[in-house]
């Protein structure tokens, strides 16, 4: 059972304000107190916050293939063990394990593995929670494949999706697809009926088709700017529609590579902090040295902050969530409340779990992260358990 904790003298980023020199109490894995005054009840452990640190809701990464040597498509318990245990280092307290376009049997194995791991292993770990699965492909456009292997791309297939969702035990929460590959929007309509997010991505659709897809139930955009038709003033394409259409919540990889800092700022200005979600889209090389790694059956060369296929195509990222938050502070001068929105609250709302995650609120899961003024992670708490403490946090 998680111990009772008291975090004291810290700036607390709540839904509506930043409480200075506040207190957050944790009992039985839940937030029990958020106050400007010290609670009267005793706690088994007290955490004195470092000077100028900030308490945020735990970050939720809804689009992550892997990191630290692991990849969702490895379809092994050790893969999810690694992701769950290492993601708190970057402030992530929950995530969607993300697949890639592959041979159908390989996708099935990854889905079954996630279901079985969550049932058998997760409760014994003190790390990030697996909220479900983001199925990226294979129902995408070969014209905008990006790093999705073209040989396994196929048109949308509702029956195949139903099979996969059964194998996943209902864990598929987001499906990235191209609407032009979904005849009569059959899959989009099915996803809406099942309360699964239909995300437009790896698509060459025009604005009219996307607007029709939104009417059918599409509500999300996968990694804005990447693997999609570009903006033109006479045909806004996917980018223009994502920015201007109020019906779409939009993902963004804020690494300064997948999108220029000004493009990231434009996304923030257009969508505001209520309809933008930071993601990493990271692959297994995150946290490792430069070198050649496998991603979706392809060789990816990692140098510095970039991961590229042999033809120069970007192949996922090696971004960490706290780095994305820092970049957005730099690119947009946004507030800490904005950061809480785009790293946690919006994802929780989109997934329909805002009743238990996504904000520093009494009664919710104690998923919390303490960061420095430049978004370095100092301490991460997952469901009331201390999952990560930085080496520099000697005073805690």
UniProtKB/Swiss-Prot annotation:
Binds 2 divalent metal cations per subunit. Induction: Expression is repressed by the HTH-type transcriptional regulator NagR. It catalyses: N-acetyl-D-glucosamine 6-phosphate + H2O = D-glucosamine 6-phosphate + acetate. Disruption phenotype: Deletion of the gene prevents growth on N-acetylglucosamine, but has no effect on growth on glucosamine. The active site is at 281 (proton donor). It comes from the Bacteria. Keywords: Carbohydrate metabolism, Hydrolase, Iron, Metal-binding. InterPro entries: Amidohydro-rel (IPR006680), GlcNAc_6-P_deAcase (IPR003764), Metal-dep_hydrolase_composite (IPR011059), Metal_Hydrolase (IPR032466). Its EC number is 3.5.1.25. Involved in the first committed step in the biosynthesis of amino-sugar-nucleotides. Catalyzes the hydrolysis of the N-acetyl group of N-acetylglucosamine-6-phosphate (GlcNAc-6-P) to yield glucosamine 6-phosphate and acetate. Essential for growth on N-acetylglucosamine. Homodimer. This is N-acetylglucosamine-6-phosphate deacetylase.
